[in-house]
Design a protein with these regions (language model features):
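Terminal, non-catalytic domain-edge segments
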Residues: 2-70, 74, 78-83, 87, ...
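Eukaryote-skewed repeat-based solenoidal scaffolds used as protein-protein interaction platforms
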Residues: 95-251, 261-263, 272
Length: 340
C-alpha cells in the first residue's frame, strides 16, 4: 500500500496563501472561473462554503443549454455564433489560435456539439441532473461523427486536452466509449521519437492531452486512477521530466504533478522536482504564480493557481457534489433542470 508523504510545511503555507488570495477575489471572476475554482476546492476539502459557486454553475449550465436549444432551432443565430467563434481564433496570430482556426473552420459544428453541448451535459450529469431537453440533446450527439473526430490528427494538434475531456464525457453519460481511440490518435499524432520536431506550443499540446487523459479518468479529481491503466503516460513523464521542466508552462507542469498524486505515486523523483519548481514559481508578495510572460492577471491566472493550490497541499480526491448525496446544495433548481 502506498502511503501519502506529507507536504513540506512551506508548501502548505504557500498553498494556503494562494487559496486565501483567490477566495478574497473569487466573485470578481466570471461564473465559469468561479465554478472551476470552487468545484476543485470542494472536491479537495468537502467544505460547504463553495456551495455558492456550485449553485451558480448549475444556473449557468441551465442557461447555456436553454440558449443552445433555441439556437439549434434558429439557423441564423447558430451560424452567427459559429462565425463569432471562428473570428476570435482568426484574429489570433499565435500558433494555438492559427491551428484552431484552420482545423475547426472545416468542422464548425465542433464548437456547439463537443465544446458546448457535451460539456454542459456532462457537468449536469456530474451533479446528478439533466436538462428538460436531454433526449433531444442526446439525439444531436448521436448524429455527430465522434469516431471521425477522435481519429483526426489535425484536430488533435489543435484541441488535444479538449478531445481527451470529450472522450471521457461521452463515456460518462453513456453515449459511447472513444477513450482508447483518442489515446491511439494522440500517440500517432505525437510519436515520442519525433518530439524534437515539435514547437514549444505543440509540445505543450501533447502534454496537455496526456494530463487530461489522467484528470478526466479521475472524474476531475473525484477519485484516484491506476498507473497500470496509463503506463505509457507515466513512463513518458518520468523519462522526459527535465525537458518538461525546461519547456512546459507552469499549468502543464502542475497537472503532471497532480497526475502522479492521483495515482498515489507520492515518492516519485519527478514529482519532487515538480513540487520544487511550482513552489519556486510562486511570487510570495503577489500570492500567486505568474504566467510564463510574467503577468499577474487574477482572472487569467485562475487555472494555473488552483492547480498550484492542489499540488502544494494535496488532500485526496472526493466525489460529488450531486443532488442525491448533497440535496441541500441543489435546492431551487432552474425550471429546465431535474434530477436524473
Amino acid at each position: 500500500m502506498v502511503s501519502k508523504t506529507l507536504p513540506e510545511e512551506v508548501h502548505v503555507q504557500t498553498s494556503n496563501k494562494i487559496k486565501t488570495h483567490y477566495e478574497h477575489g473569487l466573485f470578481t471572476l466570471s461564473i465559469y472561473k468561479q465554478s472551476h475554482f470552487g468545484l476543485r476546492m470542494y472536491r479537495q476539502t468537502l467544505d460547504p462554503k463553495y456551495t455558492t459557486t456550485i449553485r451558480a454553475d448549475v444556473a449557468d449550465m441551465s442557461l447555456r443549454l436553454d440558449k443552445l436549444y433555441h439556437q439549434m432551432h434558429n439557423k441564423a443565430e447558430l451560424d452567427g455564433y459559429v462565425e463569432d467563434r471562428l473570428a476570435s481564433y482568426k484574429k489570433g496570430k499565435d500558433e494555438r489560435s492559427v491551428r484552431r482556426f484552420e482545423a475547426t473552420q472545416k468542422h464548425p459544428e465542433y464548437f456547439y456539439i463537443a465544446l458546448d453541448l457535451l460539456h454542459h451535459m456532462a457537468r449536469l450529469d456530474d451533479y446528478g441532473l439533466k436538462h428538460q431537453h436531454d433526449a433531444y440533446f442526446r439525439k444531436l450527439l448521436r448524429g455527430y461523427d465522434f469516431k471521425a473526430l477522435f481519429s483526426n490528427k489535425t484536430m488533435t494538434e489543435a484541441w488535444a486536452a479538449q478531445l481527451a475531456n470529450q472522450a471521457y464525457w461521452l463515456k460518462q453519460i453513456g453515449e459511447g466509449d472513444y477513450t482508447d481511440l483518442f489515446v491511439e490518435t494522440l500517440k500517432k499524432t505525437y510519436p515520442d521519437r519525433k518530439d524534437y520536431l515539435l514547437s514549444q506550443q505543440q509540445f505543450g499540446n501533447k502534454l496537455y492531452g496526456m494530463t487530461h487523459v489522467i484528470i478526466a479518468d479521475s472524474g476531475y479529481y473525484q477519485h484516484n486512477v491506476k498507473e497500470s491503466d496509463h503506463p505509457w503516460i507515466y513512463t513518458y513523464f518520468r523519462d522526459n521530466i527535465d525537458d518538461i521542466l525546461a519547456y512546459a508552462k507552469e499549468d502543464i507542469i502542475a497537472e503532471i504533478g497532480l497526475s502522479f498524486k492521483l495515482a498515489g505515486l507520492y515518492d516519485e523523483p519527478a514529482l519532487k522536482k515538480i513540487e520544487k519548481r511550482i513552489y519556486s514559481s510562486v511570487d510570495q508578495d503577489k500570492e500567486m504564480v505568474p504566467s510564463d510572460t510574467g503577468s499577474f492577471s487574477f482572472s487569467w491566472g485562475e487555472h494555473r493557481n488552483v492547480l498550484a493550490i492542489m499540488l502544494l497541499n494535496w488532500q485526496k480526491p472526493n466525489g460529488g457534489p450531486d443532488i442525491q448525496q448533497n440535496p441541500t446544495m441543489f435546492e431551487d433548481l432552474p425550471q429546465s433542470l431535474t434530477a436524473k
